[in-house]
């Protein structure tokens, strides 16, 4: 198994898979772990090229989804719930569309059928390869969090920004290129399993309008 993963919670409980956003690791879910493990077996993993998961060159959205299926197979999990944020949410949409038999339901947060635009992602991939992660880490707190949240939970902000700063530049760039090519706008209407859609009013990238499109 190429994915680094962590499994927490009571054996025999329903399994929920958590998928991280671009530039973070499965540690991003730590604040939710106590609440979720009260009722679920929680499976977290580091996405391709993130955290302790190795990078294997070019990656696509389909491969990100297939990684999840391979992980479920590796752990002999026939069916699970899934929750992903941003890139992890887009992965969840792919899974709901192309592997519905493996999931009871999917929750997607701060995501879209098409996140951003191709030129922006390709430009970001070039930038991190040339200049390192500092080029995207600068200003990340302002992009990711509202003023009120930064004041209320500075430790969460610091932890996630630390994950971004210490991400592998090539792994990050490869996922940027995957997002540049990923477009499920013509596919989400075919999703037949329940999907919970969560959006943030202050999110400038994956907007409420993007969430409404998924409806």
Q: Which ranges hold each PLM region?
A:
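Short beta-strand/loop motif that positions the catalytic acidic residue
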Residues: 191, 197-199, 203
């Amino acid at each position: 198994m190429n994915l680094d993963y962590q499994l927490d919670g009571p054996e025999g409980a329903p399994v929920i898979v958590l998928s991280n956003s671009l530039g973070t690791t499965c540690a991003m879910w730590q604040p939710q772990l106590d609440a979720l493990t009260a009722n679920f077996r929680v499976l977290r993993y580091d996405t391709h090229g993130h955290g302790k998961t190795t990078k294997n060159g070019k990656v696509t959205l389909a491969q990100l989804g297939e990684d999840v299926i391979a992980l479920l197979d590796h752990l002999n999990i026939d069916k699970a719930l899934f929750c992903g944020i941003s890139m992890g949410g887009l992965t969840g949409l792919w899974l709901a569309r192309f592997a519905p038999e493996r999931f009871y339901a999917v929750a997607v947060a701060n995501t879209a059928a098409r996140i951003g635009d191709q030129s922006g992602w390709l430009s970001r991939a070039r930038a991190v390869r040339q200049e390192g992660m500092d080029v995207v880490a600068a200003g990340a707190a302002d992009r990711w969090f509202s003023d009120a949240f930064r004041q209320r939970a500075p430790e969460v902000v610091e932890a996630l920004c630390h994950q971004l700063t210490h991400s592998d530049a090539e792994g990050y760039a490869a996922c940027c290129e995957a997002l540049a090519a990923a477009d499920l706008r013509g596919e989400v209407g075919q999703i037949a399993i329940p999907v919970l859609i969560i959006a943030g009013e202050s999110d400038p990238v994956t907007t409420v309008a993007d969430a409404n499109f998924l409806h």
